[in-house]
Design a protein with these regions (language model features):
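Core nucleotide-handling region used for phosphoryl-transfer chemistry
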Residues: 2-532
Length: 532
């Protein structure tokens, strides 16, 4: 079938929590199992059944820690036995349960009765899936092999949306070698997948998690800021799904990824209110509401502001300045940790400069950590700011994205000139700067280089501390991972690679109903009806 827009990405879609068209690669045997196999999908380990998928098949991969559409799960009978009433085949299950009850209610059960009960119970299980009522996709271990995500055939999706039945999935593949295709969260106009958030009794005030364009629309609502002058940070993509974008000879910089909260601070042109006389206020009001005498009144209008450079600061997606965003709340942490850091660094921000970074440690003056367990060596009640990105805009409008090494040099110079800042500001930790072919010279460029270099990076303890505990934290917590950027990249982008140990800890926290700010920010705007 001709390629149409059956699969689309909503404005709030986050690539880390969505579906993806994929091509199945090599099936690797799993010790002790004749019917299970491991396959690397989008750079991530998956366990599949050999009788369901084979090398070269095209499929749809639902990424880890997502929630799937309830109607999709129902029509495919994917809810677990305990939630069978949500499945389309509920009447068959009820019939089997009644037969099982008849055998179990006998005063005396024969050996043959027990065999029948076992057969009926096995049949009942086969009619149901393994999803709980929330439709959560989560990591599981099968035969000691981690399996991230959920893999489905096109026919399974077509049970929910018949329009997609004859789609040629190969047309949606972006990189044939890696078997990586397009990301999407919407099928035929209906939301299929979204980030999973554990149900909690009292949810903290949520900031927006709209993707970059939607976040940026918020700036337009604040008349005192130009949307061209203030930019929220772009989304950091997963290296697993984007390793194919990196060439062996690309000059890259790899830095340590910190587990904190995002912070943006800028010194940009803002509109500062001017106190007007009653007469001028009246003229301005009339001009605003009147549709007549526009030409006459417009000549009388007096600007109620002047433009000058001023400080604007925000979390990942919410402008915090009260004078700009009058409806701002204290947010996820119930305190303005961003304002605390902003007061420290704003005197050193040049005109036209925007600084992006991570705040880590504890909430100021509190024994509560910004991210549970991740103290990063801070004393109780203390924190620090690590800049990882800087942009500048000259008065003529020329914009420049700084290299990571320049961000590092700027931070080091700032601390050197102002030693009193050394406990509050830290430079980005650069772990490697160069090409990946030089970092891993033994990996052949001609034979599956992307897959092999990604696997090497995932297990690189020497350079990147992967799968180790974080060496800086006093608590024993897993190292989160790394961030890769291309040097002199014409596109503002970065790619993250998290450790398996971090994913496991994240899963355990979600199982316990705990959610951090990054995931909390990924809920607003989603359209799936979450089942309580």
């Amino acid at each position: 079938m001709k390629k149409l827009n059956f699969f689309t990405a909503s404005p709030e879609m986050k690539s880390e929590y969505c579906a993806q068209v994929v091509k199945i690669g090599e099936l690797k045997p799993i010790e002790g199992s004749d019917y299970l196999a491991q396959v690397i999908i989008s750079g991530t380990s998956m366990v599949i059944r050999k009788d369901e998928f084979k090398t070269g098949d095209y499929a749809i991969y639902c990424k880890n820690e997502t929630a799937l559409n309830p109607d999709f799960l129902s029509l495919n009978n994917l809810y677990e036995v305990g939630e069978f009433m949500r499945n389309a085949n509920r009447e068959k299950v009820i019939e089997l349960q009644e037969n099982i009850y008849k055998y179990n209610s006998k005063v005396v059960r024969t050996e043959e009765d027990l065999m029948h009960i076992k057969e009926l119970e096995d049949r009942l299980k086969s009619l149901c899936g393994f999803f709980n009522k929330h439709g959560r996709v989560k990591m599981i271990n099968l035969r000691k092999v981690p399996s991230f995500g959920f893999l489905i055939k096109l026919d399974t999706l077509a049970n929910w949306k018949p329009q997609v039945k004859d789609i040629d999935l190969s047309e949606y593949i972006l990189n044939e070698e890696m078997g990586i295709g397009m990301d999407f969260d919407t099928v035929c106009g209906e939301k299929f997948i979204q980030v999973y958030i554990p149900p909690i009794k009292e949810r903290p005030a949520r900031n927006s998690q709209k993707r970059e364009k939607k976040r940026q629309k918020k700036v337009e609502r604040f008349e005192r800021i130009s949307k061209e002058d203030f930019k929220f940070h772009y989304d950091t993509q997963s290296l697993n799904s984007n390793i194919w974008r990196i060439e062996p000879t690309d000059n890259v910089v790899i830095s340590k990824k910190l587990h904190g909260t995002s912070f943006i601070t800028a010194n940009i042109p803002v509109k500062v209110p001017i106190k007007l006389s009653f007469y001028n206020k009246f003229i301005n009001w009339v001009y605003k509401v009147s549709t007549r005498f526009v030409n006459y009144l417009s000549a009388k209008v007096v600007q109620n502001y002047k433009v000058e450079y001023g400080n604007v600061y925000s979390s990942r997606s919410v402008i915090k300045n009260q004078f700009i965003n009058e409806k701002v709340t204290s947010g996820f942490y119930k305190t303005d940790v961003w304002g605390d850091i902003n007061e420290i660094i704003k005197p050193y921000i040049d005109k036209g400069m925007t600084i992006y970074g991570e705040i880590c440690g504890y909430l100021t003056g509190s024994d509560k950590m910004i991210q549970k367990g991740y103290d990063y060596g801070c004393k109780i009640g203390e924190n620090f700011f690590m800049p990882y990105r800087i942009t500048t805009t000259n008065e003529d409008g020329t914009k420049r994205e700084w290299e990571v090494t320049e961000v590092y040099d700027w931070t080091v110079k700032l601390i050197s000139e102002h030693p009193e800042l050394k406990d509050k500001i830290q430079p980005i930790t650069i772990l490697y700067n160069g090409s990946l072919s030089n970092l891993y010279p033994d990996i052949s460029i001609q034979n599956h280089w992307h897959e092999n270099v990604l696997e090497a990076m995932k297990n690189d303890k020497k350079h990147f501390y992967m799968e180790c505990n974080d060496p800086v934290c006093k608590n024993k917590v897993p190292y989160e991972g790394i961030v890769l950027r291309k040097n002199e990249d014409p596109i503002a982008e970065a790619f993250k690679l998290k450790t398996l140990a971090f994913f496991k800890r994240e899963k355990a926290n979600i199982d316990a109903g705990e959610v951090d700010m990054e995931m909390s920010n990924s809920t607003e705007g989603n359209e799936l009806e979450l089942i309580n």
